[in-house]
Amino acid sequence: MITVYGYVPAWGIPDISPYVTKVVNYLSFTGIEFEYKTQDLATLDQDSPHGKLPYIVDSDGTKVGDSNTIIEYLKNKFGDKLDADLSKQQLAQALAFHRLIEEHLYWSGIIQARWQDDAGWETYIPFIVQGAEVTPEMRVGLDAFRARILDGFNGQGMGRRSEEVVAEFFRADIDALSDFLDDKPFILGDKVHSIDASLYSTLRHIADQPQQWLGSGYVQTKPNLVDYLERIRKQYDI
């Protein structure tokens, strides 16, 4: 049994972290038996291999952190259940989209909305604290956590741009994904692959998060992306 540790579910999504959600998606797509547990954030640094979420604990006690490393571990242990049919060209396409999704779209579509925007941040806090009352001491810790995330946002470069420019980048990425998906059921064809675990997670987070910003609602203007989300939701009940 694989145990996945995350933050907390929200908005009908398995977890508020797109990377935790990606791991849950991969496990659901492959049919690997797993359970999800909410991590005690007070002991995260001690419990997680990298002090971050997600991480998994295997039945033999093995701990693995980082969503990409987790998926590679699962492939090595259980076999490559999703990608064995892909050609080298398709694997290259998957890698390129992986970079677009997790190193570009993640920042514009999620970090901008939840962490950079002040109103979005205030909307996000109740989900982070799981509905608990925010004490002054908790607020200090939350704001410090936000500052750390925004340091990464600025270091990536996206955070140094105006919301208008970030929204332009965001819409261009969504356009590219919609154009490539076209009328295919899944991003690389007729069945799900590992890249769909990441794409489905990120698009769900963008489409379903309550934070409002200049990119809000844009995913919903793409009928094929809306159909893609609904197709996976129905097929895998996630």
Swiss-Prot record:
Every GST C-terminal domain range: 118-238
Activity at various pH: Optimum pH is 8.5-9.0.
Reactions catalysed, as given in the entry: 2-glutathionyl-2-methylbut-3-en-1-ol = (3R)-3,4-epoxy-3-methylbut-1-ene + glutathione
Activity regulation, short description: Activity is inhibited by 1,2-epoxyhexane.
Cited Pfam families: GST_C_6, GST_N_4
GST N-terminal domain span: 7-82
Disulfide linkage: none
Xref: PROSITE patterns: GST_CTER, GST_NTER
UniProtKB keywords: Lyase, Plasmid
Enzyme class: lyase
GO cellular component: cytoplasm
Coiled-coil regions, chain positions: none
Enzyme Commission no: 4.4.1.34
GO terms of molecular function: lyase activity
Family, as annotated: Belongs to the GST superfamily.
Quaternary context: Homodimer.
The protein's role, per its UniProt record: Involved in isoprene degradation. Catalyzes the glutathione-dependent ring opening of various epoxides. The highest conversion rate is observed with the physiological substrate, 3,4-epoxy-3-methyl-1-butene, which is the primary oxidation product of isoprene. It can also use other epoxides, including epoxyethane, epoxypropane, epithiopropane, epichlorohydrin, epifluorohydrin, epibromohydrin, 1,2-epoxybutane, 1,2-epoxyhexane, cis-2,3-epoxybutane, cis-1,2-dichloroepoxyethane and trans-1,2-dichloroepoxyethane.
Protein name according to UniProt: Isoprene-epoxide--glutathione S-transferase
Originating organism: Rhodococcus sp. (strain AD45)
